[in-house]
Design a protein with these regions (language model features):
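Class I S-adenosyl-L-methionine-dependent methyltransferase module
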Residues: 1-96
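Conserved beta-strand signature within the Rossmann-like core of class I S-adenosyl-L-methionine
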Residues: 5-7, 110, 136-148
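Short, charged/polar "capping" segments at the starts of alpha-helices
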Residues: 12-14, 150-153
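Short aromatic-enriched loop/helix-cap "lid" or pocket-rim segments at secondary-structure transitions
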Residues: 15-19, 102, 155-157
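A short acidic, Gly/Pro-enriched loop at the edge of an enzyme's catalytic core
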Residues: 92-111
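A short SAM/SAH-binding and catalytic strip from SAM-dependent methyltransferases
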Residues: 108-123
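A short glycine-rich, Lys/Arg-flanked "PGG" loop and its adjoining helix->strand segment in the class I
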Residues: 125-138
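Core SAM-dependent methyltransferase catalytic element
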Residues: 155-188
Length: 188
């Protein structure tokens, strides 16, 4: 699996580039996953938290919890260097740009766009959706936690929706919508 990240934040891109360079030298990347035990988390969320990263890494020693956050639980996962080395960070604004696809890449099978589209108005969301659609292969999927208006003729349609609840707090959850690129006549 290749992972291409698209971000306009130079700090995010620099961080990912440094992690990739370190991975090429054989160094793993450690992810710290905090969880507040005072919150009544959904059992499925806790099971997910306990197993996150198991397919690409191994448990690691978590960071020390600062005294001000006493009680916070942290799970750490050391991601294998060969996984991190497959990340390709790209500086790209999905509203006004799209990734140029070469002959070796017909488009992505999956694009995950969470906590992104919410920052744009309806017009910008439409532009972003058009660019994301062009980057998908025919039949490819886009997952978002922000429903966007579908524009007839854009070549993408909503194919599913799910609400995911993390805890008993009212704002702890997401509404995941998935869209599928419709193959155009010349792509069939």
């Amino acid at each position: 699996v290749d992972v291409v990240t698209l971000d306009i934040n130079p700090q995010v891109n620099a961080h990912l580039t440094q992690a990739k360079q370190a991975a090429r030298r054989g160094r793993p990347y450690t992810i710290q996953l905090p969880r507040d035990p005072q919150v009544r988390w959904n059992p499925d969320f806790i099971a997910y938290w306990r197993s996150f990263g198991d397919q690409v890494g191994v448990p690691a020693t978590p960071a020390r919890v600062p005294p001000a956050l006493a009680g916070l639980q942290i799970r750490a996962v050391r991601v294998q260097p060969e996984v991190v080395a497959r990340i390709e960070p790209v500086d790209l604004n999905i509203v006004v740009q799209r990734l140029a696809l070469d002959a070796n890449r017909e488009g992505f099978d999956l694009i995950v766009a969470t906590n992104i589209l919410v920052y744009y108005d309806a017009f910008e969301q439409g532009l972003a959706l058009a660019n994301l659609t062009r980057m998908l292969r025919p039949g490819g999927l886009l997952l978002s936690n922000n429903a966007v208006p579908e524009v007839p003729g854009m070549g993408i349609r909503s194919v599913g929706y799910r609400t995911t609840v993390y805890s008993d707090r009212p704002d702890d959850g997401d509404h995941i919508v998935w869209y599928q690129k419709i193959a155009s006549r010349n792509e069939r």
